[in-house]
From Swiss-Prot:
This is UDP-N-acetylenolpyruvoylglucosamine reductase. Belongs to the MurB family. It comes from Thermosipho melanesiensis (strain DSM 12029 / CIP 104789 / BI429). The keyword NADP applies. Keywords: Cell cycle, Cell division, Cell shape, Cell wall biogenesis/degradation, Cytoplasm, FAD, Flavoprotein, NADP, Oxidoreductase, Peptidoglycan synthesis. Pathway: Cell wall biogenesis; peptidoglycan biosynthesis. Its EC number is 1.3.1.98.
């Protein structure tokens, strides 16, 4: 109780045994020890200093927690949503959604984020995994990231981040906690930017099963020119079900929660797809989502 009192005195919201299904887009997941919501970056830093055994959660759009109790703490960045312009850079707190960044940039006439519109994640999560869509990657726009390494706050420039396809230094070094992300500014025309964003969203709605809970595309593209969704469709798994989990009939690269799926249903589906793809194509798949 002393720890909880300390967290509350810092100004956090604190929830005991909070179910993760309430906080992730898959709508799956059992309880964690403590679920903590800081309201400012300073509060976030102070909270990190009094907690151990912590996972950081952004918008929860790329995470599959297990069904059972998870004996660790989760800090949510959902309230860390500041955004402003300084020295020709858009600076965003890590919990800001990509959607809000895109809308802010479009309103200000800043181009370069159009293809990110509709990616259902936070700015911090996008930097963490170098999120992307339609040929665009987060790394293209990043100038710097402010991180906490457990001792001090550091500013890393883009050359230090080891960006590659769905990967970065932050995935390799979990001790680096993302606080803020600085994006470069490319001047454009608001009308044209909004028009392009509308086209991107239409494409998403047409091709992706947005009407069902999911964590987006489950698997990384293993090599250039190999499209996982098409490969899954070719081996006849489109629409295949395990428990409440199903390979989307709209886009086979998505596993959806169509009927109160358990985490184990999704995990079993992932392993089945990996096995079938390897047997049919000799390709080893890696997951794009984080499995807790």
């Amino acid at each position: 109780m002393k720890l909880i009192d300390t967290l509350l005195k810092l100004g956090n919201d604190v929830h005991i045994n909070e179910k993760m299904k309430c906080h992730v887009s898959f709508k799956i997941g059992g309880p964690v020890r403590l679920f903590i919501i800081p309201y400012t970056v300073d509060m976030f830093l102070e909270t990190l200093n009094v907690l151990d055994n912590v996972k950081i959660l952004g918008n929860g759009t790329n995470v599959l927690p297990k069904d059972e109790y998870m004996d660790f703490n989760v800090i949510s960045t959902e309230k860390l949503t500041g955004i402003f312009v300084e020295n020709d850079t858009i600076i965003c707190e890590s919990g800001l959604s990509l959607k809000k960044l895109c809308l802010y940039a479009a309103k200000e006439g800043f181009s370069g984020f159009e293809n990110a519109y509709g990616i259902p994640g936070s700015v911090g999560g996008a930097a963490y995994m170098n999120a992307g869509a339609f040929g665009w990657e987060t790394a293209e726009m990043i100038e710097f990231v402010d991180v906490y390494d457990g001792k001090k706050v550091l500013r890393l420039d883009r050359t230090e981040m080891k960006f590659s396809y769905r990967n970065s230094i932050f995935k390799e070094n979990e001790d680096l906690i993302i606080l803020r992300v600085g994006f470069r500014i490319i001047k454009g025309d608001s009308y044209n930017i909004f028009s392009r964003m509308k086209q991107v969203m239409i494409k998403r709605v047409e091709k992706q099963p947005l009407e069902f809970p999911s964590a987006g595309s489950v698997f990384k593209r293993p090599r250039k020119g190999f499209y996982v969704g098409s490969a899954i469709e070719k081996i006849g798994l489109k629409g295949f079900r395990i428990g409440g989990a199903m390979i989307s009939e709209k886009h086979a690269g998505f596993i959806i929660n169509y009927n109160n799926a358990k985490s184990s249903d999704v995990k079993d589906m992932i392993e089945l797809v990996k096995d079938k793809i390897y047997k049919n194509f000799g390709v080893k798949l890696e997951t794009e989502i984080e499995i807790w």
